[in-house]
Amino acid sequence: MRLILLSSLLLLGIFLANGHEEDPDGKVLNSLIDTLMHLQKLYANLKYSFLTVHRARSFGSGSERLYVTNKEIKNFEALRQICEQAEGHIPSPQLENQNKAFANVLERHGKEAYLVVGDSANFTNWAAGEPNKAAGTCVKADTHGSWHSASCDDNLLVVCEFYFIL
């Protein structure tokens, strides 16, 4: 909304800078009002479209988090850099439905992927016999969403997590 107001002020400033100091018939002002109303409608439509997609994605996955792959296969450090550049995060499912949404991506691609498990995690989905520090200091999820210890040098499917917080 602020962007719309700033755009209107910019249009007015351009008009005044071009030497049009007067607007006796109110044509310029009316034009600015029309433009502002049009921009407000565009903003409302964009917001509605975004929220519709957000609700659909959340409904379909049961999660307010979106797990996306670029289909690359990389080690943990490369994954960290890729997710950071995309302004996302390494997956860190905090709830069962989030883990299921993450596992759906892995199952669809038939690949395993890294995830991060916090020290104070309320939800975990370790496979039997895990965690096993001898296998490595990283954690990967299999195509069923079960978690396993892994080497951080393993090349796994790149999956980043994005939050929908409104």
Curated annotation (Swiss-Prot):
Residues in C-type lectin domain copies: 46-161
Keywords: Calcium, Disulfide bond, Glycoprotein, Lectin, Phospholipase A2 inhibitor, Secreted, Signal
Residues glycosylated per entry: N122
Signal peptide: 1-19
Cysteines joined through disulfide linkages: C83-C160, C138-C152
InterPro entries for the chain: C-type_lectin-like, C-type_lectin-like/link_sf, C-type_lectin_CS, CTDL_fold
Tissue: Expressed by the liver.
Any one Gene Ontology cellular component term annotated for this protein: extracellular region
Domain of life per record: Eukaryota
Cell location: Secreted
GO molecular function: carbohydrate binding; phospholipase A2 inhibitor activity
Function summary: This phospholipase A2 inhibitor binds directly phospholipase A2 in the presence or absence of calcium.
Family label: Belongs to the alpha-type phospholipase A2 inhibitor family.
Subunit structure: Homotrimer; non-covalently linked.
Record's protein name: Phospholipase A2 inhibitor clone 10
Species per Swiss-Prot/TrEMBL record: Bothrops moojeni (Lance-headed viper)
